Amino acid sequence: MTKDIAQVMAEVGRKAKAAAAPLSIATSEQKNKALNAAADAILEARADILEANRLDLANAEKNGMAASFVDRLTLNEARIDAIAEDIRAIATLPDPVGEVIAEWDRPNGLHIERVRTPLGVIGVIYESRPNVTADAGALCLKAGNAVILRGGSDSAHSSAAIHKALVKGLEAANLPADAIQIVPVTDRAAVGEMLKGLGGAIDVIVPRGGKSLVARVQSEARVPVFAHLEGICHLYIDKSADLDMARRIALDAKMRRTGICGAAETLLVDRAVASTHLAPILGDLAAGGCEIRGSAEVLALYPAAKPATEEDWSTEYLDAIISVALVDGISGAIDHINRYSSHHTEAIVAEDAQTVARFFNEIDSAILLHNASTQFADGGEFGMGAEIGIATGKMHARGPVGVEQLTSFKYRVRGSGQVRG
């Protein structure tokens, strides 16, 4: 790490801290004006953004990056339209800042209110997905937070072009341009500086990316982190489940999009209905192109499966692969999930109310679903608008991190001359 990088990042932190103060008291109208103007600017800069993206794609091709990586990096007309639409959607969300969460009166006449406030300065560290530049910038702005964006170097040109449009939005609403900054250097030492907190400037870090990035952030950060390391999500089929429903949900939970953190990675089936339910469900998955890895009991009932190893139960595949085991009812499912889960998302298919109640009460994961696909683990599906990520920690934010989760709170206490005496 060079002294220059430390100095550059310290200046970024100072600017963000200075911008956070006026942004925290900006009106809803100002913030929405900035967001809509940013969406307009992105559409107006379409040609520039596509040209910048072509430079990033050329570098990716030269470096032999995988097809899935190139797809995440690629922007086109439709994706730029979607970025602008997402920003406009964030503008339509209720402004959380200033919301009175709770209020009560004390016997001495004091009136107490708990009120939402911005967090301050948020650092977002992400890999080469240019749309995150827009999503994170817009969400933080809506919640009244300044943000420092550090995207992957592979998307540097694309992110810079999008950032330019976001700044135009801020300027159109007379908000500080430094409220949304992009790290001006690609040196990885800049990430290390952010994880130290930039001298107290950063209030929280949000990593968006693969396991290695998130693990580094969680181990090195000296400020709070909103993140999940893995999405080892389970789907349990109870003996009381409707088979047709179970088949639909299992296929969607695994195969709708295999590479997202809400995709099911392990299927658990109640041993009591294995003889009737297992083969149809696994047949659907196999027909959809999914590789089945099963326990010895599963192999006996479904010989087309491959043997599962101990490692499979704690693996996030992010691919068309699923591990399958039989369990002794809800108790067995709870034991397995609490042992192997990453505490992201779990789902149960069941009709018995007591079984569902145990699932909800005894499993400690951020998102629990009944008779619905794990792929609903998404801020947009929760009605939160876009999300900046999903958190599995227990402090402050848990589950989808949307605008509301990017706030803290303070207490306002109104009196009429009371003294404690």
Curated annotation (Swiss-Prot):
CDD domains: ALDH_F18-19_ProA-GPR. One of its GO terms (cellular component) is cytoplasm. Pathway: Amino-acid biosynthesis; L-proline biosynthesis; L-glutamate 5-semialdehyde from L-glutamate: step 2/2. GO terms for biological process: L-proline biosynthetic process. It is found in: Cytoplasm. Its EC number is 1.2.1.41. Gene3D superfamilies: Aldehyde Dehydrogenase, Chain A, domain 1, Aldehyde Dehydrogenase, Chain A, domain 2. Catalyzes the NADPH-dependent reduction of L-glutamate 5-phosphate into L-glutamate 5-semialdehyde and phosphate. The product spontaneously undergoes cyclization to form 1-pyrroline-5-carboxylate. Keywords: Amino-acid biosynthesis, Cytoplasm, NADP, Oxidoreductase, Proline biosynthesis. It catalyses: L-glutamate 5-semialdehyde + phosphate + NADP(+) = L-glutamyl 5-phosphate + NADPH + H(+). It comes from the Bacteria. SUPFAM superfamilies: ALDH-like (SSF53720). InterPro entries: Ald_DH/histidinol_DH, Ald_DH_C, Ald_DH_N, Aldehyde_DH_dom, G-glutamylP_reductase_CS, Glu-5-SA_DH, GPR_dom. HAMAP family: ProA. Belongs to the gamma-glutamyl phosphate reductase family. This is Gamma-glutamyl phosphate reductase. GO terms for molecular function: glutamate-5-semialdehyde dehydrogenase activity; NADP binding. The keyword Cytoplasm applies. Pfam families: Aldedh.
